[in-house]
């Protein structure tokens, strides 16, 4: 919290009716997503999938740096996630400012989750099952890695 100057809110957020407000402890400067399998002819295993996906993240950075301004409807402001700024970009387009104070939830697995989400803009044509690896580089230069095995699909609304 101190690294982002998030030290002055000092208010009760909820009585259990609101989701827990949490952000990653790290701020990030770079994101790369790769697969262990060939995606298509242009994306062999191990290469960046930057041009076949977008990332949706939510940040509370603006809310904190603007002095925690919630207006007069504080409960609704928090309940509706109005304190979060939504960013949707290709990984290579994300800036360090975009990836500062990234929100996450350990309990929200809905399609409307505010946690980071990868959205595919094209489906793989060679291999169907992929182990995707996300590498997030912190502003200090440390690399955080997570992998998941899945069968990527494109949301029909994007086609």
Sequence positions of predicted segments:
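Non-catalytic macromolecular-recognition regions in eukaryotic signaling proteins
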Residues: 1-159
């Amino acid at each position: 919290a101190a690294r982002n100057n998030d030290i002055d809110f000092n208010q009760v957020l909820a009585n259990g009716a609101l989701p827990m407000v949490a952000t990653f402890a790290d701020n990030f400067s770079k994101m790369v997503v790769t697969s262990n399998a060939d995606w298509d002819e242009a994306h062999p295993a191990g290469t960046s999938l930057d041009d076949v996906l977008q990332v949706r993240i939510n940040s509370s950075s603006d809310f904190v740096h603007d002095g925690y301004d919630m207006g007069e409807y504080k409960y609704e402001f928090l309940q509706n996630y109005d304190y979060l700024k939504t960013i949707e970009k290709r990984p290579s387009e994300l800036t360090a400012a975009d990836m500062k104070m990234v929100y996450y939830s350990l309990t929200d697995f809905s399609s409307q989750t505010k946690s980071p989400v990868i959205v595919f803009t094209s489906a793989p044509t060679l291999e169907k099952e992929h182990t995707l690896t996300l590498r997030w580089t912190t502003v200090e230069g440390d690399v955080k890695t997570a992998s998941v095995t899945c069968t990527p699909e494109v949301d029909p609304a994007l086609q």
